[in-house]
Amino acid sequence: MITRETLKSLPANVQAPPYDIDGIKPGIVHFGVGNFFRAHEAFYVEQILEHAPDWAIVGVGLTGSDRSKKKAEEFKAQDCLYSLTETAPSGKSTVRVMGALRDYLLAPADPEAVLKHLVDPAIRIVSMTITEGGYNINETTGAFDLENAAVKADLQNPEKPSTVFGYVVEALRRRRDAGGKAFTVMSCDNLRHNGNVARKAFLGYAKARDPELAKWIEENATFPNGMVDRITPTVSAEIAKKLNAASGLDDDLPLVAEDFHQWVLEDRFANGRPPLEKAGVQLVDDVTDWEHVKIRMLNAGHITLCFPGILVGYENVDDAIEDKDLRGNLENYLNKDVIPTLKAPPGMTLEGYRDSVISRFSNKAMSDQTLRIASDGCSKIQVFWTETVRRAIECKRDLSRIAFGIASYLEMLRGRDEKGGTYESSEPTYGEAQKKLAKADDFESALKLPAFDGWRDLDTSELDQKVIALRKVIREKGVKAAIPA
């Protein structure tokens, strides 16, 4: 296994940390030490520790599950070191040992140890990757859910927390009472305006606990928004074995990620920050324009490729993008429907971003399932396609490619590809009646599905007729016959 001792004798093809591993100190506490965090935030911090050694990371796991206990044991055995293999679309890989994570605590085993770190003045940022659903926002009301059982328990016994909200707010309470400074609360989850979501969640909890404390947090802590991006696949036992064989390491915690990585972060920090710009982080006043580019090109591009790709019979994204017809349709969608109606952020060319999207989809080492990308298509269409569709209708642009995308989505919901294969399409927001509507031969009624609510207030008559016509072509002649010229 990898340890501080084995750092002295790494294989020649493996990069060691470029700093004194014994000379770095924590400046960040991070909740939710998953693969994405280890390949993203920790990756950026890794690169600045040589210049700023007081910004290492203490990781915290919140659950006491057997899996969490095993992870804690593995981190401890390896001195929190692990390998990261970065793989380019060409197949070329680089391997480095990561040392930015200096400690890992399992919160249920020692809650006070976690609070001790959080209260330490040396900790100036508390970050998290707790998933989109982890912020405990009620989907109906849009407010922090105070009915959550774990939240209720923390509010009843706030000095002995179990949730991330309880830990962070209790730590800020102790800092305030000691006359100390607040820290920055930094979400690194892959959701729009993640800082605003975090702010709503933590202040929602704090207000329920103590309105005066909530006011102090609101005035002293900051919650910067950030846009994060890097494909980091799950590492199975088989993949771990292959990674170790290629690197020559004996690593119980290996990671693999694409060579592409991006982090655009609002420069709003309450108590100092590491020089992340030296590692390539783009520090900006507002991340909105970058979020729009990612949503309308990368995320929308994914489903634009996968809906028809599934119908043709492709199971993996990298195989679908190699199909010249599907690739051509995606390129036309980006070039003709998205780029002309999208604002490029400073320092970015939309054409360059388009090329990176196509390249990333073709990376076989990052292969992803088309069905996974297409799952919950209703929600994804609402978020990823709506702005482009609205612009096209309002500006009276050609609707053919958009109609083809919608027709492909509706045909995909039938669960049968052109080769006769069957599959299960996942639409968790649809009830039984909506699922039947999607699979019925009544093409017009299917356009009433909630996936298309984002542009229902506009005149959609032309778009609707094109969708109906293209569904007929797909049924009679196949997907490729329906692809617009």
Swiss-Prot record:
GO terms for molecular function: oxidoreductase activity, acting on the CH-OH group of donors, NAD or NADP as acceptor. Disulfide bonds: none annotated. It is found in: Cytoplasm. Its EC number is 1.1.1.-. The keyword Nuclease does not apply. Keywords: Cytoplasm, NADP, Oxidoreductase. InterPro entries: 6-PGluconate_DH-like_C_sf (IPR008927), 6PGD_dom2 (IPR013328), Mannitol_DH (IPR000669), Mannitol_DH/Oxidoreductase (IPR050988), Mannitol_DH_C (IPR013118), Mannitol_DH_N (IPR013131), NAD(P)-bd_dom_sf (IPR036291). One of its GO terms (cellular component) is cytoplasm. Belongs to the mannitol dehydrogenase family. This is Polyol:NADP oxidoreductase.
